[in-house]
Curated annotation (Swiss-Prot):
Its cofactor is [4Fe-4S] cluster. InterPro entries: Aldolase_TIM, Elp3/MiaA/NifB-like_rSAM, LIAS_N, Lipoyl_synth, rSAM. Gene3D superfamilies: Aldolase class I. It comes from Allorhizobium ampelinum (strain ATCC BAA-846 / DSM 112012 / S4) (Agrobacterium vitis (strain S4)). This is Lipoyl synthase. Pathway: Protein modification; protein lipoylation via endogenous pathway; protein N(6)-(lipoyl)lysine from octanoyl-[acyl-carrier-protein]: step 2/2. It holds the Pfam family Radical_SAM.
Length: 323
């Protein structure tokens, strides 16, 4: 998937990660063969690139060197990142800029909806930076974007990938009430890594958030993803699966962590394709409707196709239960 940022001002040459500037460089491991991909050159990729340029948008995929950019852009898939490009958190794995964000762009919901319509998207993913500076964590903005897309492109299915709305009472309820088709909130890693990898978040708050979505709307699909290769143990990953199933999460994604810069958390190891397949098999036995587990899996990768499969798998499960 393409992660797109709507920028209204040019870069101000600010330090992208000021909180990491003082840290020593970490070792960058050589990527194994199963991680490497060909440089994007297809006609579809070039057309998407021109489309993005014509909308005066900037892609995180380009800046971060996402390994899936060629495949996703060829298919004209898009994930829009809303509420600016500056995050109030400072996760050790993430390449999004950190600092004090700008004010919300009130035209953004309409602009995103217009782009969705013009690009002819059948399925769109909306994500955002964390906005701890806002009273509702950006819940109203998510709501407005969903409504705008529904009006501009009624046939488009909507998947949201949200922050955790930590200490924002009522925020989650507002977003769920806007009726996205899929609610995704990534756990990112196992609980033992949170203090070093995701220090601004709370593991069981995220589990509870996903559980609460199902309580508010039992028909809404829920989804979560993690990275591996951050030093986690296998038994920790299996326990995380159990925690997500306790929250009735439908869809789990597991992918390899790739280090953005030498200032970010190091890759402890590259998990083999065979291990990813093992995780997938185990996750299905635990009751997930959908599992995507591979080195290059990302939470929005193949999102449209996966949504169709997710619906079909639920229908099969309901039919089997009725027999």
């Amino acid at each position: 998937m393409v992660t797109i940022l709507d920028r209204t001002k040019p870069d101000d040459k600010r330090i992208r990660h000021p909180e990491k500037a003082h840290k020593p460089d970490t070792e960058v491991l050589r990527k194994p063969e199963w991680i490497r991909v060909k440089a994007p050159t297809s006609k579809g990729y070039q057309e998407t690139r021109e489309l993005v340029r014509s909308h005066k948008l900037v892609t995180v995929c380009e800046e971060a060197g996402c390994p899936n950019i060629g495949e996703c852009w060829e298919k004209k898939h898009a994930t829009f990142m809303i509420m600016g490009e500056i995050c109030t958190r400072a996760c050790a794995f993430c390449n999004v800029a950190t600092g004090k964000p700008n004010a919300l762009d009130r035209e953004e919901p309409a602009n995103v909806a217009k782009a969705v319509r013009q690009m002819g998207l059948s399925h769109v993913v909306i994500t955002s930076v964390d906005r701890d500076d806002l009273a509702d964590g950006g819940a109203e903005h998510f709501e407005q974007v969903i409504w705008a897309i529904r009006e501009a492109s009624p046939a488009t299915t909507i998947e949201i990938l949200t922050p955790d709305f930590l200490k924002k009472p009522g925020a989650l309820e507002r977003v769920v009430a806007a009726k996205p088709d899929v609610f995704n909130h990534n756990m990112e890693t196992v609980p033992g890594n949170y203090l070093t990898v995701r220090p601004g978040a709370r593991y069981f708050h995220s589990v509870r958030l996903l559980q609460r979505v199902k309580e508010l709307d039992p028909t809404m699909f829920t989804k979560s993803g993690i990275m591996v290769g951050l030093g986690e143990e296998r038994n920790e990953v299996l326990q995380l699966m159990d925690d997500l199933r306790t929250a009735d999460v439908d869809f789990l994604t597991i992918g390899q962590y790739l280090q953005p810069t030498r200032k970010h958390h190091k890759v402890e190891r590259f998990v083999t394709p065979e291990e990813f397949k093992s995780y997938e098999d185990i996750a299905y036995t635990k009751g997930f409707l959908m599992v995507a587990s591979s080195p290059l899996t990302r939470s929005s990768h193949h999102a449209g196709d996966d949504f169709a499969r997710l619906k079909a798998n639920r229908e099969k499960k309901l039919l089997a239960a009725a027999e």
